[in-house]
Amino acid sequence: MKLNEVEAAANVAAALAAKAAGARRRIAIISDHASPLAAPGSVDCGGQNVYVAQLARELARAGHLVDVFTRRDAPEQRQIAHWLDNIRVIHVPAGPPRYVPKEQMLPHVDAFARHVTRFARRQPAAYDIVHANFFMSGMVAQHLKTALGLPFVITFHALGRVRRLAQGTADTFPTERMRIEAALMRAADRIIAECPQDRHDMERLYGAPHSRIAITPCGFSPDELWPVPMPEARARLGLDEGRFIVLQLGRMVPRKGVDTVIQGVAMLRHRYGVDAQLLVVGGDTGGHGGDGLELARLRSVAADLGIAAHVRFTGQQPRAVLRDYYSAANVFASTPWYEPFGITPVEAMACARPVVGAEVGGIKSTVNDGVTGFLVPSRDPAALADRLARLHRHPELARAMGEAGRRRACEHYTWRHVAAQLAAIYADVLDTARPAAPAAAYPN
């Protein structure tokens, strides 16, 4: 896939944006397991949570009314949380009010769909459009389309067939996931691919209709992420000013390839003689099990390689301090087995840091190889170590790549830009949908 396909898609969406200008929509965002209120890096909390939260924020800033429906996973959660101006988070009672792994949520989807449908019927004005996130949310959106005639678009965030090819028997989702995804691609009014590879996988593995797939990437918020002077960031985090620091940030699950980064940093130290430290940010501290097991495995990997003293596992961190972590690093590394998009490389670019990323999924579209960083094969720690060593030897190259990445992120990957593209897609879908009454602001 050519790097400029994302930019070309963005230009098309920008041309459509005039259709959305001035039209206030009532938008229902379905995100069954990924609440916008969850702490990034906690169990089952990653890019989809950020996507839903930032999309809702920017749509509301543009004047739209947004309800986000997510499963109630704690008894103290209020049914309706007035989160920000014109954004409500609706906690849906479906299954027990506690954490349930998303792989085990399929039996609760019918209850989720029934509740959302009843809630929608009780509203003083109908929703204009539904935006589903993940395949189980798509099932809810399809129920709303059948029951209430609401058009829906869907962002899958990950595809079952791609996951199964990458993980094999380690994939614990029910096998009917793939059948459901194929049916949703036929039923959706528009399918949102996050990168050219995502669209290619939909067409090749599912037979999705090309004409109904729109490429819209993920993004970052300039209000949240910007370059901080490295000495200042390191001082706040208690980091040595003189060391070469590699950052990895994300969920602690095997497919993220954190072990490859640990192995690469070990090679960087032992083979290239670089005084390198690895920061691993993310991971749940709530005792839900999966993240804890992976964290223990990763600690063991570091110990076996003799670099345990040079790897710091910070656990999950508030988003307000992430710019310090990005800015404190010399380079950001991300080597997943597969990645539908990959928000963290874009966030690192926004903080003017070079990225060494696996040549998979969205990363091979966002990282301009040789310009904003380097692309390497996934599960290849030697290739990773080679690129890290090159950046260590040539700090001026690292600085130039970071600056180029910052420009690229600001030009193509802000959440405001993403939301404008999606609002244009909504408008395009609604060209053939029923007329709607003027929207009224939600009561506080």
Model segments located where?
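Short hydrophobic beta-strand element within catalytic cores of glycosyltransferases
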Residues: 354-357, 367
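A short helix/loop element that forms part of the nucleotide-sugar donor recognition site in Leloir-type
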Residues: 226-239, 245
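N-terminal subdomain of nucleotide-sugar transferases
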Residues: 2-89, 442-444
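Carbohydrate-associated surface elements
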Residues: 197, 219
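Short alpha-helical donor nucleotide-sugar binding micro-motif in glycosyltransferases
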Residues: 324-329
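Aromatic "clamp/platform" in nucleotide-sugar-dependent glycosyltransferases that forms part
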Residues: 337
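Conserved acidic donor-binding segment of nucleotide-sugar-dependent glycosyltransferases
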Residues: 369-370, 374-381, 390-395
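Nucleotide-activated donor-binding/catalytic signature segment of Leloir-type glycosyltransferases, i.e.
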Residues: 291-316
